[in-house]
Amino acid sequence: MTERTARNARAEAEAVAGTAARVLEPSPPTVTSEPWFADDPVALDGEDAVSPTSAGTRTWDDLAASDPAIAAFAQRHWLGNHKALPAVPADYVSSRDDFHRVAYGVISNARKAANGKFGLRYTAGGFGTPFFGDDEQVRVEGTELIVQRGDTVVAETLTTLARAAEVAGTVANADQAEHDTIELGDLDRALDIREDVGAFLGDWFGFGTSVLEEARLLATAPDDDLSRVQMWPGHFDPAFEMGSLEAGRRATYGASPGDGSHDEPYLYVASWGDIDRSNEYWNDDGFNGGSLSYAELLAADDPRALAQDFFRRGYDILHA
């Protein structure tokens, strides 16, 4: 194991920005209040803070425009000055699936043992838990499993599920699997953990979380019942829900890294109710909804604008 410096995403951002700031990642201290048992990293709570979304009066893009150091920091953390999406790595699926196994088979269990919650979040360079217990966080950055407990941080390259569980101080099991989740398999098998795929997933989850947090601002109806962005480990995708279930408007808005029906990442809107398949928006036969492919995002002059248009169209159709 190697030692690392403890992270506090919001404090790091505020030190760089020189003012109150919001981020896309969890920060300590541990939140023990229901229902989320987690912080909301973008919530302004009435404060005039620099924001990764258009909800505030100042964005990270505003600051990045005149300060190269801020621009570099914002880009690394998907807060602003956004870089182009990378190409999908060769032989992506096998390695992606093993990162998925780590997420649902190990990391989610560490959080669940502390407070009964198993939702994960985007963290810089990968994914991990919100803070729990005594300011603890378990996360993956690139190919490394990182365990932070207070000011103590250890890191180790991912090798097997059994070893990952040992380092994280938890058990490896399939308790968080969904009906379509890949099987966990042999806990002692050498995982296909690759640097290029780890970096790619970190970028995808950063991009996905950033466009989803912006899409949450679409919720304007009084009964939209907006949830937070979190990663369901069984599906391995950042997502949130909004819209009235009773009125047939509720849907999940998400950013999948790919699954059994999709080799590459995609954005999606999955309706909780009936949809009219004659509307070309509802184009995905893999689930009850519509998707926007990674190829379409790569081909776009402005992938972020295309993503927002896709989510907006879904919201408008459901609320028509």
Predicted region positions:
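A domain-level signal for the structural core that forms small-molecule/cofactor-binding pockets
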Residues: 2, 124, 152, 277
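Long, compositionally biased interface segments
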Residues: 276-320
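Hydrophobic, Leu/Ile/Phe/Ala-enriched alpha-helical segments that form helix-helix packing faces
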Residues: 103-114, 168, 208, 212-219, ...
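N-terminal ordered "arm"
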Residues: 6-139
